[in-house]
Amino acid sequence: MADYQTIYTQIQARGPHITVSGEWGDNDRVGKPFYSYWLGKIGDAQIGPIYLGASGIAAFAFGSTAILIILFNMAAEVHFDPLQFFRQFFWLGLYPPKAQYGMGIPPLHDGGWWLMAGLFMTLSLGSWWIRVYSRARALGLGTHIAWNFAAAIFFVLCIGCIHPTLVGSWSEGVPFGIWPHIDWLTAFSIRYGNFYYCPWHGFSIGFAYGCGLLFAAHGATILAVARFGGDREIEQITDRGTAVERAALFWRWTIGFNATIESVHRWGWFFSLMVMVSASVGILLTGTFVDNWYLWCVKHGAAPDYPAYLPATPDPASLPGAPK
């Protein structure tokens, strides 16, 4: 007889698809699911059916348009040479308009395509959010996933639209591309006095580490007590059995305090939400209320004022002959 393993799923449950009472009553599923043996090794083996609906189709259409704009502009950088496109893919990018355009509409070849790609990407994310929210309501679920996703969308809007608007230049936006967007992150930090001194950046990183710690601790705990039925978490919320009692005792022995089966999920949801919220606040404060985070920390006693041993290095962009 097969036994249940907690490191990987050895038993794959397959049976008739059970309908769920939704917003419009009991309805049969549209589409026929199929099964994947290998995906069943790490999760549910059933694939589909997938429901797109109007908002899902719109999200797919807008997203595909944004991706095509980005890829065609990347290909144009290497004169549509397929070999060079794949060879240099990580270095190719679609860049925002130059600072000289401010908040104006630039020509397509000089940042206009970046604006169009950003517009379609925003429409795609917004349409997908509507889909996530409406599917949750149709199934009678809470809308927790939708609001976490909304926080992530807000962060994307902050770095690509809201922050450039507040400082008055599209050039502050993030380029599309693998290395280009990482280069932007480095330049953004240097321009505003080392972003690591921004407290909200620290909060965001702290919440991100907290998410990893919470998920690791919770996942390991449930796997450890699965032999006692701890994987049936919904039942254990209202009727604690030996699994939860053992898990709680372990954590009280270890750190003196334990979460409940319900509260640990609330912590994870809140921490993941605050990763994006904290990062968004930091972006919005940068360049608007704080021009140099290091000097801001020195002023408020949060960082040491290092003596200048070497002469100040001028900004290369301010030197005569530099491109404007």
Curated annotation (Swiss-Prot):
The residues that cross the membrane are 52-76, 111-137, 143-166, 198-223, 260-284
The entry's Fe cation-binding residues are 218, 233, 265
Q: Which UniProt keywords apply?
A: Bacteriochlorophyll, Chlorophyll, Chromophore, Electron transport, Iron, Magnesium, Membrane, Metal-binding, Photosynthesis, Reaction center, Transmembrane, Transmembrane helix, Transport
Origin: domain of life: Bacteria
**Which GO terms of type biological process are on file?**
photosynthetic electron transport in photosystem II
Q: How does it sit in the membrane?
A: Multi-pass membrane protein
The segments annotated as topological domain Periplasmic are 77-110, 167-197, 285-324
Please name the GO terms that the record assigns under molecular function. bacteriochlorophyll binding; electron transporter, transferring electrons within the cyclic electron transport pathway of photosynthesis activity; metal ion binding
Role played: The reaction center is a membrane-bound complex that mediates the initial photochemical event in the electron transfer process of photosynthesis.
Subcellular locations according to the entry: Cellular chromatophore membrane
The UniProt entry's sequence similarity note says: Belongs to the reaction center PufL/M/PsbA/D family.
Sequence positions that bind a ubiquinone = 251
Taken from the record's topology, the Cytoplasmic segments are 2-51, 138-142, 224-259
- Listed name of the protein: Reaction center protein M chain
Q: Name one GO cellular component term.
A: plasma membrane-derived chromatophore membrane
Which Gene3D superfamilies does UniProt cross-reference here?
Photosystem II protein D1-like (1.20.85.10)
Q: Which InterPro entries match?
A: Photo_II_D1/D2_sf, Photo_RC_L/M, Photo_RC_L/M_CS, Photo_RC_M
**SUPFAM superfamilies to which the protein is assigned, alphabetical:** Bacterial photosystem II reaction centre, L and M subunits
Provide the residue positions that the database annotates as binding (7R,8Z)-bacteriochlorophyll b.
181, 201
Assembly description: Reaction center is composed of four bacteriochlorophylls, two bacteriopheophytins, two ubiquinones, one iron, and three highly hydrophobic polypeptide chains (designated L, M, and H).
